[in-house]
From Swiss-Prot:
Gene Ontology terms for molecular function: asparaginyl-tRNA synthase (glutamine-hydrolyzing) activity; ATP binding; glutaminyl-tRNA synthase (glutamine-hydrolyzing) activity
An example Gene Ontology biological process: translation
Subunit note: Heterotrimer of A, B and C subunits.
Coiled coil regions in record: none
Protein name per Swiss-Prot or TrEMBL: Aspartyl/glutamyl-tRNA(Asn/Gln) amidotransferase subunit C
Gene field: gatC
Length: 99
């Protein structure tokens, strides 16, 4: 898929972008290079190849590097609501802003 300069200008117009002719020509080159790369990737036969969730999972075992969840502090709702101007049944009361 190759774009033309008219296509780039139309897309810029639809996106409400002001684009000088030199910038549009530069963008045209970049977009056509990108679409060329996409066409090359689509031409590769990937039948029978399982998708990868992580790019290096074929090389080594991949484990998430996250710590285990652990309680670090106890949240006391009453203490947190004490400075609030108005609270009822554990809920913060705020002024009505929409009629």
């Amino acid at each position: 898929m190759a774009l033309t300069l008219t296509d780039v200008k139309r897309i810029a117009h639809l996106a409400r972008l002001e684009m000088a002719d030199a910038d549009a020509e530069h963008m045209l080159g970049q977009l056509n290079e990108f679409f060329g790369l996409v066409e090359q990737m689509q031409a590769v036969d990937t039948a029978g190849i399982a998708p990868l969730a992580h790019p290096i999972e074929q090389i080594q075992e991949v484990a998430q590097r996250l710590r285990d969840d652990a309680v670090t502090e106890v949240v006391d709702r009453d203490d947190n609501q004490r400075p609030a101007p108005a609270v009822q049944d554990g809920l913060y009361l705020v002024p009505k802003v929409i009629e």
